[in-house]
A protein has these predicted regions:
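Structural detector for internal amphipathic alpha-helices that build alpha-solenoid repeat scaffolds
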Residues: 2-16, 26-48, 58, 65-79, ...
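Conserved acidic functional residues
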Residues: 156
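TPR/TPR-like (Sel1-like) alpha-helical repeat modules
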Residues: 214-220
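Core helices of alpha-solenoid repeat scaffolds
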Residues: 18-22, 52-53, 82, 111-112, ...
């Protein structure tokens, strides 16, 4: 019996995802379905955890590394799925961005060398996805390790990348982190300078106050100077 897309959507709208047997999703999945429906099937399979993973594996064997199936592998939160995703991440012939995004829930345990390779990619999408992984792993790393990972990204011409790096760094209070953020406040573009100054204010330590005081004296841009003074006033309230 052939089931239509409308019939599949109708079932989705009337039955809870976890109430549908995983095998049913496998039976109705097809590359001829709309991409929206294929992603919906993948999301529902991900909710089925280990049972969903068994079907996801089977569908990947039949249909290859489809985006919705890679995403589903990440959503099912199974350790075997993590091992699978890490393996295909290391395969040069397979597009990596979907795999990196699927690994997001495992950011804390992804090996540092793999994370470093992700962050070295030139694509903005890869770098942002890699920074999302680093966000979950950074508390397990020391300041030197973090700075080594983001070293190339600090010079990225895309402000969005640099801003995301600052947001990760501002959760730390080590002196070398503060110095790094201060350098961005001196040499960055308007958006990155402003983000860096706010970051120094949010760190709220004596070292970051000293850095802001120096910046308030040495920055040549009037707006940036005023922002540095504003962050100093915030720090005095917190110290």
């Amino acid at each position: 019996m052939i089931i239509t897309e409308n019939q599949i959507w109708d079932r989705f709208n009337t039955v809870k995802p976890i109430s549908i047997d995983a095998k049913w999703y496998e039976d109705v999945y097809s590359l001829e379905l709309s991409i929206q429906l294929r992603f919906a099937i993948g999301e529902r399979l991900g909710l089925l955890a280990d049972k969903g993973w068994e079907v996801i594996k089977s569908l990947i064997e039949k249909h290859g590394f489809q985006r919705e199936l890679i995403q589903a592998a990440g959503l099912c939160h199974q350790r075997e799925a993590y091992d699978f995703l890490l393996k295909i991440l290391r395969e040069e012939s397979i597009p990596k961005i979907n795999t990196v995004r699927a690994l997001s829930c495992w950011g804390a345990i992804i090996p540092t060398p793999d994370l470093k390779n992700i962050l070295k990619e030139e694509s903005i999408h890869m770098r942002l996805a890699g920074l999302n992984l680093l966000r979950f792993k950074s508390h397990l790393l020391n300041a030197t390790e973090i700075l080594e990972l983001v070293e190339d990204l600090l010079d990225d011409f895309r402000e969005e990348v640099v801003i995301e790096v600052i947001k990760i760094l501002q959760r730390r209070d080590e002196e070398k982190i503060i110095k790094c953020i201060s350098q961005i406040a001196i040499y960055g573009t308007d958006p990155t300078v402003e983000t860096a100054l706010i970051a120094l204010g949010s760190i709220g330590t004596k070292e970051s106050l000293i850095a802001l005081s120096s910046l308030s004296r040495n920055l040549t841009n009037r707006t940036h100077k005023q922002m540095a003074y504003k962050q100093i006033s915030h720090q005095y309230l917190n110290l």
